[in-house]
Structures are given as C-alpha cells and as structure tokens.
C-alpha cells in the first residue's frame, strides 16, 4: 500500500539524480521524454489490463446488485457492494497513478503524493476489512441462522459497513496529513529529500528548489505506524477470517455427515423394499466429496487473500528495522530491493481484481451478469440448485431427485421431528445448523407433503462460492 521508495531504498539512479539536482541541473525540463523500452511497454500493458479487469469486474458486481431486486433483498450483498466499491476505488484512485510512475520511472504528480498515499492506505484497508466483515457475516448466518434472520437488518449491515470505512479513513488520512506516518527524514511537499538537501539554505550558492516533475514519491514509514497500521489493516482481520472460516468448515462438516447418515438410511430402506442390492457406502463417498468441496471453497477464499497480501505486510513491518532505513540500526539485515517491494505491492492490489470472481460468481449473480452483458441467450442455461448446507457455500446441478417417500423416510427416522408450522425457535442457545433439517418435510394445507415436489442434490456437483441466504422460518428462501 505504499508508493515507490517506501522501503527505504533508493532507485539505482536516484543518487545520481540528486547529484544533478545539487548541481542545479534541471532534469526533464525542456528535453523530451526518452522512448519507452520493451520492458516498460510490457509493464504498461500488463498493468493496464489489470486495472481494466479490476474496474469492469467490480462495476459489474455493483450494477448487478442495483438492477436485481432479488440480490438487493439479501443483506449479505450489502457487504459485497461495499467490497466492490473499495476495490473500485483501488482501481481508480490508487493503481493508475502508480502504474504511470512505474512506467515513467519517477513520480510525475508532485505534491499529490501525500493524498495518493492516504487513498492507497484507505482503499486497501477498506477492502481487507470488508473481507473480514463478510467472513463474520457468513459465520453468524451459519451458526445462528434464526437469530441472524432477526438481527441482520439493513440498518445493522450499514452500521457494520460504516465502521469498516470509518476505521479505514482514521488510519489513513489523519496520520498521513499530519505526517505521523513518516520517519524522521526530511521531506518537501510529500517528496523525500536527502539530508544534505534538507540542510541547505536558500542563500547557499548551490541551493536548488525541487522539481516536482522528477521526484520520487517516497514515504518511508516509522516503526510505530508501520506495525500499528499493519495490525489494523491485515493481521487482526486475517486472524478473524481464519477463525470464522475454520468454524464454518466444522459446521459444514457436521451438517454434511448428519445429512449423509440420513441419506444412507433412506436409500438402504428403499433399496431393500425394492429387493435391490443395498449400497450404503454411496452416500458416504458423496459425503466425503462434499466435505472436500467445502474445504476447497474455503481454501480458495483464504488462500487467495493470504497469498496476495501477506508478503507485502511482512515487508511493511520488516522494512523500518532494516539497516538502510533512517530508524533502522547501523548494522542489520538489508532492505529488500525496490523491484521486489513493488511486485508485492501489486500482488496486494491484484486481490481487488480477484474478489469479484470469488465472492460474486454464483448462480444468481451469473444470471444477472448474463442479462447485463446481453448474452443470456448464449450463456449456459444449466439449472443450478443451491443446497443449503453451510448456508449456500456449495452449489450443485439438479441431477439426483429424492421424491416423496425418501423425504418422508427422513422424518420417520427423526422421532422428535415436527413440522415447521408447529416448531418455534425461541432459545438461541438451542439453535443449531442441523435444526434446519426439520424443514425438509412440510405439510400443505390439504395434508399432502410439499416435499413430494423435489429435494435435489448432486454428489458430482460443481463448487461455487455462493452468497449467504439464511433459511426463513417456513424453510424456503
């Protein structure tokens, strides 16, 4: 989340540049800019594609939710919109300026440096905090679905989003504008200068006023701000995400195994009644596959996030203790190269381009995306049924149909089961994810089971990261 030079090291030609500045030689004055080399052209193309992809993906997510009433009705999508907006700001307010500086080899925007640094910290922190809020929302919806349905109102969702953005602003604009984030190196208009330049006075013969068109937007962080901001922006949120997604997996595992045991018993009873060979291990294998898919799903969520941001935040905390840093010891481990640091900065920002794919590409979003892009007639129309295990963390194709007698068999094997119309959950402590299994069987007004329609699962289904849609009291969305 830092500009070039933030790791306390200098560009290879930076000292030569300062020497020219000290001698009064203007750089980049009337002379034309040198032509871009092959590496600069490749860098420009790659960064442009990344920025465009980030913009399009997050704009598409926002447009889909604004257009679809069904998506707007889901409170979790409030957090998805907030995440998309923060990632959109990364693509608009952060990436383009750094991309130009990367290609040009210097910071051409002068005193805008401080504002850009504040935007960088704010947008990146907001994106990470929104990911943390989404994980907490999903855990709450899965572990306490009925309480979640009562408590998670639009007002509550907006309060949670507001807190995430407020915290992001507090740790970015206030410290940056007050220069609390900087080390003790002298600076001019947000542009760091060597100590010998800082000690010059206007009446000295070789005094030079900095040329803002040829400077480096260097913002070396002091130790206090580097560690505290990293804790708030990354380490605490990632710890919360690890805990919540671990709990989600355990809850999903329990649900899958309990449902699988009911499936095996029902299949065994049905096959024995029809004099067919009993194969109870089929559902067991399906259960293992489902658990594996849930694990893969959660691994993608955490794996992408950690791989994108962890390297940067490790360096962000390590750099103030480097030997080349103004606050670092005279002898210590050297700072990383500028190229390495920049690569990890872009890795972190690349997370904003992947979030729309991870958090929004489920069946409902895909349908609206197809309408927005005008390809609804060409896109796949394979029906997707979301199985409410772990509150729609998994989606399956409609292939295997369990009819009336199997659904009824589940109820006969659950002696304490009651229909949802007669069962109320008043005690949150007694509520558990498996309570929703009672909602499989429902009686219509004329006494016929509604479950005779279908209850569909697909053991070979395709995984997708779906939104959270908690069960309503009547057992349907």
UniProtKB/Swiss-Prot annotation:
Entry's transmembrane regions: 40-66, 78-104, 115-136, 159-180, 224-246, 297-320, 341-360
Lipidation (S-palmitoyl cysteine): 375
GO cellular component terms given for this protein: brush border membrane; ciliary membrane; cilium; non-motile cilium; plasma membrane; synapse
GO BP terms in the entry: activation of adenylate cyclase activity; adenylate cyclase-activating adrenergic receptor signaling pathway; adenylate cyclase-activating dopamine receptor signaling pathway; adenylate cyclase-activating G protein-coupled receptor signaling pathway; associative learning; cellular response to catecholamine stimulus; chemical synaptic transmission; G protein-coupled dopamine receptor signaling pathway
Protein's UniProt name: D(1B) dopamine receptor
Keyword Ribosomal protein: no
Extracellular side: 1-39, 105-114, 181-223, 321-340
Taxonomic source organism: Homo sapiens (Human)
Family annotation (PROSITE patterns): G_PROTEIN_RECEP_F1_1, G_PROTEIN_RECEP_F1_2
Protein family: Belongs to the G-protein coupled receptor 1 family.
Residues modified by glycosylation: 7, 222
Residues in the Cytoplasmic compartment per record: 67-77, 137-158, 247-296, 361-477
Subcellular localization, as worded in the UniProt entry: Cell membrane
Topological category with respect to the lipid bilayer: Multi-pass membrane protein
Record's disease association: Benign essential blepharospasm: A primary focal dystonia affecting the orbicularis oculi muscles. Dystonia is defined by the presence of sustained involuntary muscle contraction, often leading to abnormal postures. BEB usually begins in middle age. Initial symptoms include eye irritation and frequent blinking, progressing to involuntary spasms of eyelid closure. Patients have normal eyes. The visual disturbance is due solely to the forced closure of the eyelids. In severe cases, this can lead to functional blindness.
Keyword terms: Cell membrane, Disulfide bond, Dystonia, G-protein coupled receptor, Glycoprotein, Lipoprotein, Membrane, Palmitate, Receptor, Transducer, Transmembrane, Transmembrane helix
Pfam family of the protein (one): 7tm_1
Expression sites by tissue: Neuron-specific, localized primarily within limbic regions of the brain.
GO molecular function: dopamine binding; dopamine neurotransmitter receptor activity; dopamine neurotransmitter receptor activity, coupled via Gs; G protein-coupled receptor activity
Disulfide bonds: 113-217
Function according to Swiss-Prot or TrEMBL: Dopamine receptor whose activity is mediated by G proteins which activate adenylyl cyclase.
InterPro entries for the chain: Dopamine_D5_rcpt, Dopamine_rcpt, GPCR_Rhodpsn, GPCR_Rhodpsn_7TM
């Amino acid at each position: 989340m830092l500009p070039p030079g933030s790791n306390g090291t200098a560009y290879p030609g930076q000292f030569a540049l300062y020497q020219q500045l000290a001698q009064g030689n203007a750089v980049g004055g009337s002379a034309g800019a040198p032509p871009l080399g092959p590496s600069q052209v490749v860098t420009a193309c790659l960064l442009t594609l990344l920025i465009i992809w980030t913009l399009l993906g997050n704009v598409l997510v926002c447009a889909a939710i604004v257009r679809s009433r069904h998506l707007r009705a889901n409170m979790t999508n409030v957090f998805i919109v907030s995440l998309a907006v923060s990632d959109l700001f990364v693509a608009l307010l952060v990436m383009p300026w750094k991309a130009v500086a990367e290609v040009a080899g210097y910071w051409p925007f002068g005193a805008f440096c401080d504002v850009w640094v504040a935007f960088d910290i704010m947008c990146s922190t907001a994106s990470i905090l929104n990911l943390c809020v989404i994980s907490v929302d999903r855990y709450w919806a899965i572990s306490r679905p009925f309480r979640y349905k009562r408590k998670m109102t639009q007002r509550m969702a907006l309060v949670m989003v507001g807190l995430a953005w407020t915290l992001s602003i507090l740790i970015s604009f206030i410290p940056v504008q007050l220069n609390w984030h900087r080390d003790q190196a002298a600076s001019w208009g947000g542009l760091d200068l060597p100590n010998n330049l800082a000690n010059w006075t206007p009446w000295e013969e070789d005094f030079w006023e900095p040329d803002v068109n040829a400077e480096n937007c260097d913002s070396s962080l002091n130790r206090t701000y580097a560690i505290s901001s990293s804790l708030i922006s990354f380490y605490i949120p990632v710890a919360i995400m690890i805990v919540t997604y671990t709990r989600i997996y355990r809850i999903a595992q329990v649900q899958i195994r309990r449902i699988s045991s009911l499936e095996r018993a029902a299949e065994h009873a049905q096959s024995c009644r029809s004099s067919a060979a009993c194969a109870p291990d089929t559902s067991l294998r399906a259960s293992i596959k489902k658990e594996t898919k849930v694990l893969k799903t959660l691994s993608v969520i955490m794996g992408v996030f950690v791989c994108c941001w962890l390297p940067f935040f490790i360096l962000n905390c390590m750099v103030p203790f480097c030997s080349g840093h103004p606050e670092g010891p005279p002898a210590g481990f050297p700072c990383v190269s500028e190229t390495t640091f920049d690569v990890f900065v872009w890795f972190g920002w690349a997370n904003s381009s992947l979030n729309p794919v991870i958090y929004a590409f489920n069946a409902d979003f895909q349908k609206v995306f197809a309408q927005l892009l005008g390809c609804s007639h060409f896109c796949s129309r394979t029906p997707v049924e979301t199985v409410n295990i772990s509150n729609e963390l998994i989606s399956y194709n409609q292939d295997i149909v369990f009819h009336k007698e199997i659904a009824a068999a589940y109820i006969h094997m659950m002696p304490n089961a009651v229909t949802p119309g007669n069962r109320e959950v008043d005690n949150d402590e007694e509520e558990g994810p498996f309570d929703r299994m009672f909602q499989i069987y429902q009686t219509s007004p004329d006494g016929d089971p509604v479950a005779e329609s279908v209850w569909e699962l697909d053991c070979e289904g395709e995984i997708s990261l779906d939104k959270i849609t908690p069960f309503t009291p009547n057992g349907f969305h």
